[in-house]
From Swiss-Prot:
The gene is rsmA. This is Ribosomal RNA small subunit methyltransferase A. PANTHER family: DIMETHYLADENOSINE TRANSFERASE, DIMETHYLADENOSINE TRANSFERASE-RELATED. It catalyses: adenosine(1518)/adenosine(1519) in 16S rRNA + 4 S-adenosyl-L-methionine = N(6)-dimethyladenosine(1518)/N(6)-dimethyladenosine(1519) in 16S rRNA + 4 S-adenosyl-L-homocysteine + 4 H(+). HAMAP family: 16SrRNA_methyltr_A. Belongs to the class I-like SAM-binding methyltransferase superfamily. rRNA adenine N(6)-methyltransferase family. RsmA subfamily. It comes from Yersinia pseudotuberculosis serotype O:1b (strain IP 31758). S-adenosyl-L-methionine binds at residues 18, 20, 45, 66, 91, 113. The keyword Methyltransferase applies. Specifically dimethylates two adjacent adenosines (A1518 and A1519) in the loop of a conserved hairpin near the 3'-end of 16S rRNA in the 30S particle. May play a critical role in biogenesis of 30S subunits.
Protein backbone atom coordinates (compact mmCIF):
# COMPACT_ATOMS: atom_id res chain seq x y z
CA UNK A 1 0.00 0.00 0.00
CA UNK A 2 1.27 3.47 -0.86
CA UNK A 3 1.99 5.21 2.44
CA UNK A 4 1.17 8.59 0.86
CA UNK A 5 -2.49 7.57 0.42
CA UNK A 6 -4.81 8.19 3.37
CA UNK A 7 -8.62 7.92 3.23
CA UNK A 8 -8.40 7.78 -0.55
CA UNK A 9 -6.40 11.00 -0.85
CA UNK A 10 -2.84 11.07 -2.17
CA UNK A 11 -0.69 13.33 0.03
CA UNK A 12 0.87 16.03 -2.14
CA UNK A 13 4.52 16.77 -1.38
CA UNK A 14 4.28 20.27 -2.86
CA UNK A 15 1.66 21.14 -0.23
CA UNK A 16 3.68 19.50 2.55
CA UNK A 17 0.75 17.22 3.42
CA UNK A 18 1.04 14.88 6.42
CA UNK A 19 -2.34 13.79 7.78
CA UNK A 20 -2.90 13.43 11.53
CA UNK A 21 -4.42 10.06 12.46
CA UNK A 22 -3.63 9.45 16.17
CA UNK A 23 -6.84 9.78 18.20
CA UNK A 24 -5.05 10.52 21.50
CA UNK A 25 -3.12 13.37 19.86
CA UNK A 26 -6.26 14.67 18.14
CA UNK A 27 -8.21 14.66 21.43
CA UNK A 28 -5.33 16.38 23.24
CA UNK A 29 -5.15 19.16 20.64
CA UNK A 30 -8.92 19.75 20.67
CA UNK A 31 -8.86 19.89 24.48
CA UNK A 32 -6.02 22.42 24.33
CA UNK A 33 -7.95 24.61 21.87
CA UNK A 34 -11.18 24.21 23.89
CA UNK A 35 -13.50 25.71 21.26
CA UNK A 36 -16.79 27.15 22.51
CA UNK A 37 -19.96 27.78 20.42
CA UNK A 38 -20.18 31.37 19.21
CA UNK A 39 -16.42 31.88 18.90
CA UNK A 40 -14.81 32.80 15.57
CA UNK A 41 -12.74 29.68 14.93
CA UNK A 42 -10.52 29.44 11.83
CA UNK A 43 -8.61 26.33 10.79
CA UNK A 44 -5.67 26.57 8.39
CA UNK A 45 -5.07 23.44 6.32
CA UNK A 46 -7.92 21.19 7.51
CA UNK A 47 -6.82 18.41 5.16
CA UNK A 48 -9.02 15.35 5.65
CA UNK A 49 -10.73 16.86 8.68
CA UNK A 50 -8.95 15.04 11.54
CA UNK A 51 -9.17 18.17 13.69
CA UNK A 52 -12.05 19.80 11.82
CA UNK A 53 -14.58 17.10 12.74
CA UNK A 54 -14.10 17.13 16.54
CA UNK A 55 -13.82 20.94 16.65
CA UNK A 56 -16.92 21.41 14.45
CA UNK A 57 -18.80 18.97 16.70
CA UNK A 58 -18.50 21.59 19.45
CA UNK A 59 -19.39 24.52 17.19
CA UNK A 60 -22.35 25.86 15.24
CA UNK A 61 -20.02 27.23 12.56
CA UNK A 62 -16.33 27.56 11.73
CA UNK A 63 -14.14 28.80 8.89
CA UNK A 64 -11.49 26.71 7.13
CA UNK A 65 -8.73 27.74 4.71
CA UNK A 66 -7.59 24.96 2.37
CA UNK A 67 -5.33 25.43 -0.65
CA UNK A 68 -5.82 21.91 -2.07
CA UNK A 69 -8.84 22.03 -4.41
CA UNK A 70 -9.64 18.32 -3.96
CA UNK A 71 -9.61 18.53 -0.17
CA UNK A 72 -11.75 21.69 -0.20
CA UNK A 73 -14.28 19.85 -2.38
CA UNK A 74 -14.31 16.88 0.02
CA UNK A 75 -15.05 19.18 2.94
CA UNK A 76 -17.80 20.95 0.99
CA UNK A 77 -19.60 17.62 0.48
CA UNK A 78 -18.83 16.12 3.92
CA UNK A 79 -22.20 15.05 5.43
CA UNK A 80 -21.41 16.21 8.98
CA UNK A 81 -19.39 19.31 8.08
CA UNK A 82 -20.80 20.93 4.94
CA UNK A 83 -23.50 22.94 6.75
CA UNK A 84 -21.11 24.13 9.47
CA UNK A 85 -18.19 25.31 7.36
CA UNK A 86 -17.30 28.44 5.44
CA UNK A 87 -14.55 27.20 3.12
CA UNK A 88 -11.90 29.49 1.63
CA UNK A 89 -10.09 27.55 -1.09
CA UNK A 90 -6.96 29.70 -1.16
CA UNK A 91 -3.43 30.17 0.12
CA UNK A 92 -3.43 31.18 3.81
CA UNK A 93 -0.48 33.47 3.04
CA UNK A 94 -2.89 35.63 1.02
CA UNK A 95 -5.72 35.73 3.54
CA UNK A 96 -6.58 39.03 5.24
CA UNK A 97 -7.30 37.85 8.78
CA UNK A 98 -8.43 41.34 9.83
CA UNK A 99 -11.28 41.08 7.33
CA UNK A 100 -12.28 37.66 8.73
CA UNK A 101 -12.29 39.13 12.24
CA UNK A 102 -14.38 42.13 11.13
CA UNK A 103 -16.89 39.80 9.45
CA UNK A 104 -17.11 37.71 12.63
CA UNK A 105 -17.36 40.77 14.88
CA UNK A 106 -14.73 39.40 17.26
CA UNK A 107 -11.08 38.29 17.42
CA UNK A 108 -10.23 34.99 15.76
CA UNK A 109 -9.15 31.71 17.29
CA UNK A 110 -6.80 30.22 14.69
CA UNK A 111 -5.48 26.66 14.64
CA UNK A 112 -4.03 24.12 12.26
CA UNK A 113 -1.64 21.31 11.45
CA UNK A 114 0.54 23.62 9.37
CA UNK A 115 2.43 22.39 6.30
CA UNK A 116 6.01 22.37 7.52
CA UNK A 117 7.34 23.87 4.29
CA UNK A 118 5.49 27.16 4.88
CA UNK A 119 5.08 27.27 8.66
CA UNK A 120 7.64 30.00 9.37
CA UNK A 121 6.55 32.49 6.65
CA UNK A 122 2.92 31.81 7.55
CA UNK A 123 3.54 32.68 11.19
CA UNK A 124 5.21 35.94 10.17
CA UNK A 125 2.11 36.65 8.04
CA UNK A 126 -0.14 35.96 11.05
CA UNK A 127 1.97 38.15 13.36
CA UNK A 128 0.92 41.15 11.25
CA UNK A 129 -2.71 40.40 12.21
CA UNK A 130 -2.32 39.85 15.96
CA UNK A 131 -4.76 42.71 16.67
CA UNK A 132 -7.42 40.53 15.02
CA UNK A 133 -6.43 37.24 16.70
CA UNK A 134 -7.27 36.01 20.20
CA UNK A 135 -5.03 32.94 20.14
CA UNK A 136 -3.37 30.40 17.86
CA UNK A 137 -2.69 26.67 18.24
CA UNK A 138 -0.38 25.07 15.68
CA UNK A 139 1.18 21.71 15.00
CA UNK A 140 4.73 22.42 13.82
CA UNK A 141 8.08 20.74 13.50
CA UNK A 142 9.42 20.28 17.03
CA UNK A 143 12.55 22.18 15.95
CA UNK A 144 10.39 25.21 15.04
CA UNK A 145 8.57 25.08 18.39
CA UNK A 146 11.95 24.92 20.14
CA UNK A 147 12.90 28.10 18.27
CA UNK A 148 9.64 29.81 19.23
CA UNK A 149 10.08 29.16 22.96
CA UNK A 150 13.88 29.60 23.14
CA UNK A 151 15.66 32.02 25.43
CA UNK A 152 18.83 34.01 24.72
CA UNK A 153 22.23 32.28 24.72
CA UNK A 154 20.99 29.19 22.86
CA UNK A 155 21.36 27.95 19.29
CA UNK A 156 17.58 27.77 18.89
CA UNK A 157 17.22 31.49 19.69
CA UNK A 158 16.85 33.48 16.48
CA UNK A 159 14.86 36.05 14.56
CA UNK A 160 11.71 33.89 14.69
CA UNK A 161 12.06 33.72 18.50
CA UNK A 162 12.38 37.48 18.90
CA UNK A 163 9.49 38.35 16.59
CA UNK A 164 7.18 35.64 18.00
CA UNK A 165 7.85 36.65 21.61
CA UNK A 166 7.52 40.34 20.72
CA UNK A 167 3.97 39.69 19.47
CA UNK A 168 2.87 36.74 21.61
CA UNK A 169 3.11 34.74 24.79
CA UNK A 170 4.44 31.39 23.49
CA UNK A 171 3.49 28.18 25.34
CA UNK A 172 4.51 24.62 24.33
CA UNK A 173 1.54 22.24 24.60
CA UNK A 174 2.34 18.72 23.37
CA UNK A 175 5.05 16.70 21.62
CA UNK A 176 3.91 14.47 18.74
CA UNK A 177 5.82 11.51 17.22
CA UNK A 178 6.05 10.85 13.45
CA UNK A 179 3.82 7.76 13.88
CA UNK A 180 0.84 10.05 14.52
CA UNK A 181 0.77 10.97 10.80
CA UNK A 182 0.23 9.45 7.36
CA UNK A 183 2.66 9.60 5.67
CA UNK A 184 5.00 9.74 8.68
CA UNK A 185 7.25 12.82 8.49
CA UNK A 186 10.99 12.39 9.08
CA UNK A 187 10.94 14.77 12.05
CA UNK A 188 9.25 15.04 15.44
CA UNK A 189 6.39 17.50 15.79
CA UNK A 190 4.93 19.58 18.59
CA UNK A 191 1.89 21.72 19.32
CA UNK A 192 2.34 25.31 20.46
CA UNK A 193 -0.07 27.95 21.76
CA UNK A 194 0.54 31.59 20.82
CA UNK A 195 -1.47 34.25 22.65
CA UNK A 196 -1.05 37.80 21.28
CA UNK A 197 -0.12 40.26 24.02
CA UNK A 198 -3.03 42.47 25.07
CA UNK A 199 -0.43 44.98 26.25
CA UNK A 200 2.97 44.78 24.62
CA UNK A 201 5.63 44.08 27.29
CA UNK A 202 8.22 45.84 25.10
CA UNK A 203 6.39 48.32 22.82
CA UNK A 204 8.14 49.24 19.58
CA UNK A 205 7.21 52.36 17.62
CA UNK A 206 8.15 50.92 14.23
CA UNK A 207 8.10 47.11 13.99
CA UNK A 208 9.83 47.31 10.61
CA UNK A 209 12.90 48.59 12.44
CA UNK A 210 12.80 45.60 14.81
CA UNK A 211 12.49 43.28 11.81
CA UNK A 212 15.41 44.99 10.08
CA UNK A 213 17.72 44.80 13.10
CA UNK A 214 16.93 41.16 13.90
CA UNK A 215 17.29 40.11 10.26
CA UNK A 216 20.67 41.80 10.00
CA UNK A 217 21.94 40.47 13.33
CA UNK A 218 20.85 36.85 12.86
CA UNK A 219 21.95 36.67 9.22
CA UNK A 220 25.44 37.11 10.65
CA UNK A 221 24.85 35.40 13.99
CA UNK A 222 28.49 34.31 14.50
CA UNK A 223 29.68 37.91 14.29
CA UNK A 224 29.70 40.26 17.26
CA UNK A 225 26.98 42.91 17.10
CA UNK A 226 29.72 45.52 16.81
CA UNK A 227 30.33 44.01 13.36
CA UNK A 228 26.90 42.73 12.31
CA UNK A 229 25.14 45.97 13.30
CA UNK A 230 28.13 48.25 12.74
CA UNK A 231 26.38 50.27 10.03
CA UNK A 232 23.52 51.05 12.44
CA UNK A 233 25.21 51.55 15.82
CA UNK A 234 28.68 52.54 17.00
CA UNK A 235 30.22 50.56 19.85
CA UNK A 236 29.72 53.60 22.08
CA UNK A 237 26.02 53.76 21.23
CA UNK A 238 25.59 50.04 21.98
CA UNK A 239 27.27 50.51 25.36
CA UNK A 240 25.00 53.49 26.13
CA UNK A 241 22.02 51.23 25.36
CA UNK A 242 23.31 48.62 27.80
CA UNK A 243 24.62 46.16 25.22
CA UNK A 244 28.18 44.85 25.19
CA UNK A 245 29.46 45.25 21.58
CA UNK A 246 31.26 41.88 21.72
CA UNK A 247 28.00 39.97 22.23
CA UNK A 248 26.53 37.96 19.37
CA UNK A 249 22.95 38.08 18.09
CA UNK A 250 21.85 35.12 20.23
CA UNK A 251 23.04 36.84 23.45
CA UNK A 252 20.67 39.82 23.14
CA UNK A 253 17.21 39.62 24.75
CA UNK A 254 13.88 40.49 23.16
CA UNK A 255 13.67 43.57 25.40
CA UNK A 256 17.12 44.70 24.26
CA UNK A 257 16.26 44.25 20.57
CA UNK A 258 13.15 46.36 21.14
CA UNK A 259 15.27 49.03 22.83
CA UNK A 260 17.63 49.07 19.83
CA UNK A 261 14.69 49.39 17.43
CA UNK A 262 13.16 52.30 19.33
CA UNK A 263 16.50 54.11 19.57
CA UNK A 264 17.14 53.70 15.84
CA UNK A 265 13.61 54.89 15.02
CA UNK A 266 14.18 58.01 17.13
CA UNK A 267 17.39 58.79 15.21
CA UNK A 268 15.56 58.35 11.90
CA UNK A 269 12.69 60.65 12.85
CA UNK A 270 13.27 64.29 11.81
CA UNK A 271 13.40 66.59 14.83
CA UNK A 272 10.70 69.30 14.88
Amino acid sequence: MNNRVHQGHFARKRFGQNFLNDQFVIDSIVSAIHPVPGEAVVEIGPGLGALTEPVAARMDHMTVIELDRDLAARLASHPQLKDKLTIHQQDAMKVNFSELSEQAGQPLRVFGNLPYNISTPLMFHLFSYTDAIRDMHFMLQKEVVNRLVAGPNSKAYGRLTVMAQYYCNVIPVLEVPPTAFTPAPKVDSAVVRLIPHVQMPHPVGDVRMLSRITTQAFNQRRKTVRNSLGDLFTSEQLIELGIDPILRAENISVAQYCKLANWLSAQSTPQK
